[in-house]
Amino acid sequence: QESVMKKVKKIFYSSSACIYPEYNQEDPDNPNCEESSAYPANPDSDYGWEKLFSERLYKAFERNYGLNIRIARFHNIFGPEGTWAGGREKAPAAMCRKAITTEDGGSFEVWGDGKQTRSFLYIDECIEAVRRLMDSDFTEPVNIGSEEMISINNFAQMAIDISGKDITIHNLYGQEVEDKYEHPTPLGVKGRNSDNRLFREKIGWETKQSLEDGMKKTYQWIKKQCEVME
């Protein structure tokens, strides 16, 4: 309402891939995250519902008050300068930190069977995508993410390979998690991958940097943070 009163020219809302229905993400090899698949709505978390309701709120203000809205559904943005410890970090930072802090010949935990799939977009690519979206005249929700899907175990192995260490992955799930941490394993959906066809069609741009290159940059930054903490 304040934006209407102040006559704000353009508004960006950062939504999330978590808005997509759980039933479209049960196949780790072929998840459906096309923008039009958001309805019938059934996000797998309260966070996803909050993001979806907010999208509808912004679109209502667009229809009723003429606000100029841009909505991006982010898919796992990562990179240096982000949270990397304490339990609130995302998977890329967690994998890098574990590979850095685990001794050569040791092992680190990966919750679940590691077969879940995800995609991750480096922060520089995300910023460029947002800039191009804001400069466009496209006003519908659109994915901003990478289409380079990877299993969680392979993602952990990527961090290990970057470290140059001999580290084994210990998949922890089921009763083993409950016995050790006293809560169920939080796995999320089985598969999630950005579908960038709409962005390419309407905005005319696509991501270029590989996941491995982004992980190498993130790894080096987190390594410096760990050295400072020693």
Q: Could you tell me what each predicted segment is?
A:
Residues 1-46, 70:
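Conserved Rossmann-fold NAD(P)-dependent oxidoreductase catalytic core, especially the SDR/UDP-sugar
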Residues 1-4, 59, 157, 220:
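Surface-exposed alpha-helical segments enriched in charged/polar residues
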Residues 6-9, 67, 136-139:
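Structured loop/turn residues at beta-strand edges in well-structured enzyme cores
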Residues 23-31, 46, 56-134, 147-149, ...:
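NAD(P)-dependent short-chain dehydrogenase/reductase
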Residues 35-37, 75-77, 195-198:
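A short small-residue
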Residues 50:
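Short strand-loop-helix active-site module centered on a catalytic nucleophile
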Residues 101-230:
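C-terminal substrate-binding subdomain of Rossmann-fold SDR/epimerase-dehydratase oxidoreductases
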